[in-house]
């Protein structure tokens, strides 16, 4: 029996806890989520050096598992209903239950966002021609959070001068190739599928093969997305025009070649992209533009994280299905949009400390470091998840360098967070703590409350289940005396084990 359930020997004045109930309308599946008003800083357009920055909007299917934490529901079978199931992870990440999406794993998830003055947000906008989204004069602004204190340039950014050591990424060809029984695309011969792709932050390029295979990276699609993100995020409108011009731009040529199965045309457009980006790197344009940025567009954050996941976790995702039902070691993921929403609500910024208790494969820990630039900690005890988390961290470090972005410091700890000295020390400095306690036992939740006694005043604790229970005697409920709770709702497609909306809490240490 938990010590908190025993009858008290002392008479203590009863304290009435106050619970804030945030009433939010039930989201409609077809409407986009509009970023809440409690965003940490101003939510603006793409962080660019140019006064009229470019941005990218890509239509995407329902979100796939893209952020992690140890938890959710019970029952070994996967249901197509919206009832919770323990894990919806096959070889590649799929959409939550209830979604009909079966798109390529390279496709990232939609993020909650704030609308700019030029974007009314009606459903009709989704039908706008894709050219409008690439035209610098009509380009829409993508939500991100600007942090005036953040410096985004990676300390090892290659700016066209001298040599550099290889970043050590997992190349796309290592997970999707002819050797993996994939087939050539765009009428290319087997000896013609090899290509290289340049990134804005490095001299070295990534190796791809233009092939297709079930549950494999779509090399051509991945390349096209990189080209769009580089042009729309790292360049001024004038610099981006050769890439995004809707008639003769490189992106248009790539898309046309892919649609017409013109492999040679695709390779020619890719070669021109590589050459033009190299010229911009050499003349210092990339470094100059990154220096003017104060935030990373959420779509780019999601894409980078998906690149990391698809090259490290996805090929071994079956390892995550080995969990012990009915214990604290059940695996499930909070998705990118949910995590961004949490960061907004808790006002997480680059000078803060974030801790994820039960961090799974490290998705949330990495997202906090990349999206907000903060010091980010995660602790996990499941061996398979820990091994994949280490692989993700290594690839994440290399990928951020390729993209020229400096993330916050990442710390991943193995073991029980109740006993990890480094994790407990980090908790004492933490500003935001995430606990995906959807399937935690009552004993573990009670132990967590005891740990929360050491949190600093004002620390935000985000959990899927409250630590304050109405059925407990108030005078014996430690949680009610130290936590002020706000009950909230998360939207559809925010977690991996169900496509339905649900509830969560943000508790403030008082």
From Swiss-Prot:
* Coiled-coil intervals, chain numbering: none
Q: Which reaction does it catalyse?
A: L-lysyl(79)-[histone H3] + 3 S-adenosyl-L-methionine = N(6),N(6),N(6)-trimethyl-L-lysyl(79)-[histone H3] + 3 S-adenosyl-L-homocysteine + 3 H(+)
Regulation of activity: what does the record state? Ubiquitination of histone H2B to form H2BK123ub1 is required for efficient DOT1 methyltransferase activity on histone H3.
Its annotated compartments are: Nucleus
Is tRNA processing among this UniProt entry's keywords? Answer: no
Documented EC number(s): 2.1.1.360
Q: What keywords are annotated for this sequence in UniProt? A: Chromatin regulator, Methyltransferase, Nucleus, Repeat, S-adenosyl-L-methionine, Transcription, Transcription regulation, Transferase
MF terms in GO? histone binding; histone H3K79 trimethyltransferase activity
UniProt binding sites for S-adenosyl-L-methionine? 331-334, 354-363, 380, 416-417
The entry sums up its family as follows:
Belongs to the class I-like SAM-binding methyltransferase superfamily. DOT1 family.
Mention any additional remark. Answer: In contrast to other lysine histone methyltransferases, it does not contain a SET domain, suggesting the existence of another mechanism for methylation of lysine residues of histones.
**Which protein is depicted?**
Histone-lysine N-methyltransferase, H3 lysine-79 specific
């Amino acid at each position: 029996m938990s010590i908190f359930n025993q009858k008290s020997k002392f008479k203590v004045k009863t304290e009435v806890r106050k619970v804030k109930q945030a009433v939010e309308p039930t989201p409609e599946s077809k409407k986009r989520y509009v970023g809440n008003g409690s965003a940490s800083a101003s939510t603006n357009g793409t962080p660019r050096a140019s006064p009229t920055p470019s941005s990218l909007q890509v239509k995407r299917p329902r979100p796939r598992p893209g952020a992690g934490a140890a938890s959710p529901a019970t029952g070994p079978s996967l249901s197509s209903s919206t009832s919770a199931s323990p894990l919806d992870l096959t070889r590649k990440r799929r959409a939550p239950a209830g979604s009909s999406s079966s798109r390529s794993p390279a496709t990232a998830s939609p993020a909650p966002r704030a609308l700019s003055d030029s974007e009314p947000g009606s459903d009709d906008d989704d039908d706008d021609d894709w050219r409008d989204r690439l035209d610098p004069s009509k380009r829409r602004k993508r939500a991100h959070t600007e942090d005036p204190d953040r410096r985004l340039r990676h300390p090892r950014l290659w700016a066209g001068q001298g040599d550099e050591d290889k970043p050590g990424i997992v190349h796309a060809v290592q997970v999707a190739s002819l050797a993996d029984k994939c087939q050539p695309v765009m009428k290319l011969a087997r000896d013609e599928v090899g290509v290289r792709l340049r990134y804005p932050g490095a001299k070295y390029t990534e190796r791809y093969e233009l092939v297709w295979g079930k549950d494999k990276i779509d090399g051509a699609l991945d390349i096209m997305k990189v080209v769009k993100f580089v042009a729309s995020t790292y360049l001024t409108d004038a610099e981006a025009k050769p890439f995004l011009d809707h008639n003769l731009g490189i992106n248009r040529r790539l898309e046309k070649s892919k649609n017409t199965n013109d492999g040679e045309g695709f390779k020619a457009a890719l070669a021109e992209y590589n050459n033009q980006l190299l010229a911009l790197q050499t003349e210092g344009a990339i470094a100059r533009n990154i220096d003017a940025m104060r935030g990373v567009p959420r779509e780019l954050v999601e894409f980078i994280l998906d690149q990391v996941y698809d090259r490290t976790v996805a090929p071994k995702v079956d390892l995550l299905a080995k969990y012990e039902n009915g214990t604290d070691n059940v695996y499930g993921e909070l998705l990118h949009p949910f995590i961004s929403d949490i960061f907004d609500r808790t006002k997480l910024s680059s000078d803060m400390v974030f801790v994820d208790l039960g961090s799974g494969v490290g998705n949330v820990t990495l997202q906090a470091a990349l999206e907000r630039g903060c010091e980010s900690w995660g602790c996990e005890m499941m061996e398979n998840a820990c091994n994949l988390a280490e692989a993700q961290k290594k690839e994440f470090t290399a990928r951020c360098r390729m993209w020229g972005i400096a993330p916050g410091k990442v710390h991943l700890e193995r073991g029980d967070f109740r006993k990890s000295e480094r994790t407990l020390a980090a908790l004492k400095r933490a500003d935001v703590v995430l606990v995906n306690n959807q399937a935690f036992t009552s004993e573990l939740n009670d132990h967590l409350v005891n740990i929360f006694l050491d949190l600093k005043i004002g620390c935000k604790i985000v959990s899927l289940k409250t630590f304050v229970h109405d059925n407990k005697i108030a005078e014996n409920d430690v949680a009610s005396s130290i936590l002020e709770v706000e009950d909230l709702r998360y939207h559809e497609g925010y977690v991996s084990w169900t496509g339905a909306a649900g509830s969560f809490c943000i508790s403030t240490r008082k």
